[in-house]
Regions:
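Active-site recognition of the HExxH zinc-binding catalytic motif
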Residues: 70-83, 101
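Extended, non-globular alpha-helical segments
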Residues: 28-52, 69, 131-156
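Non-Sec secretion/translocation targeting segments of pathogen effectors
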Residues: 101, 164-167
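Active-site metal-coordination segments of metallo-dependent hydrolases
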Residues: 87-102, 110
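Short pre-active-site segment immediately N-terminal to the catalytic Zn-binding motif
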Residues: 55-71, 90-96
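C-terminal helix-coil-helix/basic helical segment that borders enzyme active sites and/or dimer interfaces
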Residues: 81-89, 153
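Contiguous, non-catalytic segments that form substrate-binding/exosite surfaces or channel walls
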Residues: 1-65
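Long, well-structured alpha-helical subdomains associated
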Residues: 93, 106-165
Length: 167
């Protein structure tokens, strides 16, 4: 057995952390989305997944609260982006779809003041092989982020508007 506290663990081991009102945001999103969400005990490497045919998201119940929220945003990005591609799903590769989903999740989290950069930036870089492809996917990311942002509690939206006005 080891001694010490979790502040001595690297971020990737202990999971994403933040001082966000996790439960309010999560409850609001779960009440508004048109896809089922289930929380299950999974291995530590798997944070969640979106099953397109079942129209369902599964999230690892072992995730930290913030990683749960980030994963929900990532899987919702898959849901909304794939739904918007009706008739042209073959246009995007698996790598590009992962890039869109994680970029969207990262941007939504950043808007909420949640820093997921230690996790998200390397993940995004892993999937980005072609800068030209990024330019083509930018609009898809913007649309996907917009759809997720509409799910946030009004007080979060107002906080974000106030932040934007100060900039």
């Amino acid at each position: 057995q080891t001694e010490g506290d979790d502040t001595q663990l690297p971020t990737m081991i202990k999971g994403l952390q933040s001082q966000v009102d996790y439960s309010t945001i999560l409850d609001r999103i779960l009440a508004k989305i048109d896809v089922s969400v289930d929380f299950k005990d999974m291995n530590y490497e798997q944070h969640g997944f979106y099953a397109i045919k079942e129209h369902a998201i599964t999230i690892n119940s072992r995730n930290s609260p913030v990683h749960t929220l980030k994963t929900l945003f990532h899987e919702l990005a898959h849901h909304y982006h794939l739904d918007s591609l009706k008739g042209r799903r073959d246009k995007f590769t698996y790598e590009q779809e992962e890039f869109v989903a994680e970029s969207s999740a990262y941007l939504v989290c950043a808007t909420l003041g949640i820093d997921t950069g230690d996790y998200s930036i390397p993940y995004i870089k892993h999937w980005l092989n072609d800068f030209q492809a990024f330019q083509e996917m930018r609009r898809d990311i913007e649309k996907t982020v917009g759809k997720i942002m509409k799910l946030l509690p009004e007080e979060e939206e107002q906080t974000n508007k106030n932040k934007e006005e100060k900039i």
